[in-house]
Regions:
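Catalytic nucleophile-loop/oxyanion-hole region of alpha/beta-hydrolase
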Residues: 105-108, 134-153, 162-165, 335-341
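Accessory cap/linker subdomain of secreted extracellular hydrolases
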Residues: 73-79, 83-104, 108-116, 120, ...
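Conserved alpha/beta-hydrolase
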Residues: 119-135
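N-terminal cap/lid segment of alpha/beta-hydrolase-fold proteins
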Residues: 13-59, 63, 69, 447-449
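Short beta-strand/loop motif that positions the catalytic acidic residue
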Residues: 293, 299-301, 305
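Conserved alpha/beta-hydrolase "acid-adjacent" motif
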Residues: 306-312
Length: 584
């Protein structure tokens, strides 16, 4: 008999579900509760279904669901699509070009993702195109409410609470008679954001989600502590650029969508001039919307993801744990993307979609891939950050243009050190330089044994700028720098952070700096979990413009750092005792 079966709490491949030629593939449109393109009709989402043929004969199965704005094609990286970053902070940038997306993709197949993994194991796989993309109605809003309500409507349809039709307009009703109503969502990057968006609606039937490298707040994606800061690899990208990039929906709706969403709501709300956190960004931060959420959460992220940075998953994981939601996090040491091992995902969906009591909720809630291990072999921990980690406060010792020190002892005499901004030097060049006027570098003693960092490093800095605004960039590095092309991603940069000194009081409000006046600002660097090997030195590098991430103002701004009032706090497993052992 063709039914799902389980070994060791995992759904197994069912021989009769493996034959792709017997899979039933069809598409339809699910009617939502909103009209985001203002055409007077409720938006319908384009949905496709892939299911074993046995579901036509009474077999009901749970659903693995992925939704995306990317399925029907994107704008590509056209010249002039991104904002020009070569201008002073606080200045209006030059206008950028807008690009039209040529829609691709044919009915009935929206995507082939997930199907080979999950259909043979007894799941139905469902895909849908986000509002204003592909053959879905509506407007893309990049984090707006309709991007949460669209997958909610699809889940409602899978539970018999919303209507589906065989045509985009009118048509005959389609019923999900093959669905048990239990749904799990999965996806990477934007496709990982949308499961979280759906979960924040509290929709019944969404039992579990696996967001991989999800963008959980568009402010944290395009800004950093008040600073206009691009996601890694996409210098000059902003929320309106992403809107253009994904807008593959109905051509006749595009002019209206552009005017209302991109050229009004986004341009008025995103504030590329000041970079402050405001109502626009607040409404696109899923941390603020988690109260109704109940779906069991398995998150995955790379500690060296400089596109969607590791804080995106950490902040949601932390809140979900506080809320008592079943939660696990899988962190690896690589860059953007990278799912948990299939065994972890299978156990998660088996428990929450099939209801098999496999005790996954009693597993450790933190899994971290160690530096030399494969992504399939994470190490379990009680929680993240490591419960044995505590913050160790380090003061800056003079000599930063060459190599200053990081020490437990404070300076006895007041000491100021200066750097001159010049974006033409990238961070790696500055970190490797024996001396430079363009950065300040402070090193720990050479480590006599490994140091395990786990959690969030924090910097309090007292700094003055020669101009009314300046970039502030901070890298935590492991030196000597390994310049070998085969060097691992973990070997040089430990973590990074960026801030706008104008936001020293708050993220919501910035004010021009008085040149040469000192301001004190505290901010977090990106979360990390990394073992720094003996023989290395931990270095704090302070500089101004970060060539890969920030605006590129004219070189010459001088930052002066007051060493006595600047403090780096490192989350060290074993705390002060471990630091002393490694450095004395």
């Amino acid at each position: 008999k063709s039914i799902p079966f389980f070994i060791n709490g995992e759904a197994q491949v069912v021989e009769s579900f493996k034959d792709q030629s017997k899979w039933i593939r069809h598409d339809l449109w699910v009617e939502t509760s909103f009209d985001s393109d203002d055409d007077g009709k409720m938006d319908r989402m384009h949905v496709s279904v892939t299911r074993p043929s046995q579901t036509d004969n009474g077999l009901k199965l749970p659903v693995v669901y992925e939704t995306s704005p990317y399925y029907a094609g994107t704008a590509g990286i056209a010249s002039g699509l991104f904002w020009d970053v070569k201008h002073e902070l606080g200045e209006k940038p030059k206008p950028r070009k807008h690009v039209e997306v040529t829609r691709t993709g044919k009915r009935p197949i929206i995507s082939n993702s997930q199907i080979k993994t999950w259909v043979p194991r007894g799941y139905i796989v469902v895909h849908s195109s986000s509002p204003g993309t592909g053959l879905s109605d509506g407007a893309p809003t990049v984090g707006g409410k309709n991007e949460s309500m669209a997958p909610k409507a699809v889940i409602d349809w899978l539970n018999g609470r919303a209507k589906g039709y065989n045509l985009r307009e009118g048509g005959e009703e389609e019923i999900a008679f093959w669905s048990t109503g239990k749904v799990g969502m999965i996806g990477t990057s934007y496709n990982g954001t949308l499961p979280l968006a759906a979960a924040t609606t509290g929709v019944e039937g969404l039992e579990a989600i696996i967001p991989i490298a999800p963008n959980t707040s568009y402010y944290h994606y395009y800004r950093s502590n008040g600073l206009v800061r691009s996601p890694g690899g996409y210098l000059g990208e902003d929320i309106d650029v992403l809107y253009d990039y994904i807008h593959s929906g109905k051509e006749e709706n595009r002019a209206r969508n552009n005017k209302v969403v991109r050229d009004t709501e986004m341009i008025n709300g995103m504030d590329r001039i000041k970079g402050d956190y405001n109502e626009f960004w607040e409404s696109r931060d899923y941390l603020n919307q988690m109260k109704p959420m109940k779906a069991a959460l398995l998150m995955a992220h790379g500690f060296n993801d400089w596109n969607v940075m590791p804080e995106h998953s950490y902040r949601i994981y932390k809140k979900a744990m506080e809320m008592g939601i079943p939660t696990q996090i899988y962190y690896h040491q690589d860059g953007h993307g990278g799912p948990p091992p299939l065994k972890m995902m299978n156990r998660w969906f088996t428990r929450y979609l099939f209801g098999v009591e496999n005790k996954v909720e009693k597993d450790p809630n933190t899994w971290i891939v160690r530096e030399n291990d494969s992504q399939k072999n994470p190490t379990p921990y009680k929680s993240y950050p490591n419960p044995d980690a505590s913050l160790v406060s380090l003061s800056l010792q003079p000599g930063g243009q060459e190599k200053g020190g990081l020490s437990l002892k404070k300076n006895k005499i007041k000491k100021l050190e200066r750097l001159t901004d010049d974006y033409s030097f990238d961070g790696a060049t500055l970190a490797k330089a024996k001396n430079s006027v363009h950065r300040l570098l402070y090193l720990s003693p050479v480590l006599k044994q490994d140091i395990h960092l786990s959690g969030v490093s924090k910097l309090t800095i007292r700094v003055a700028s020669s101009k009314r605004a300046a970039n502030l960039s901070v890298w935590l590095v492991s030196l000597p720098w390994n310049s070998d092309r085969k060097a691992k991603i973990t070997e040089n940069i430990i973590t990074r952070g960026w801030a706008d000194i104008q936001n020293y009081k708050s993220l919501n409000e910035s004010s021009d700096l008085i040149p040469d006046k000192f301001y004190t600002m505290s901010f977090d660097l990106q979360p990390d979990d990394q073992v720094i090997k003996k023989g290395q030195q931990i270095g704090l590098m302070i500089f101004s413009s970060d060539q890969e991430f920030t605006l590129h103002p004219k070189p010459g701004t001088i930052l002066t750092v007051d060493l006595n009032s600047t403090l780096l706090k490192l989350p060290i497993v074993g705390g002060l005792k471990s630091f002393n052992k490694a450095t004395r």
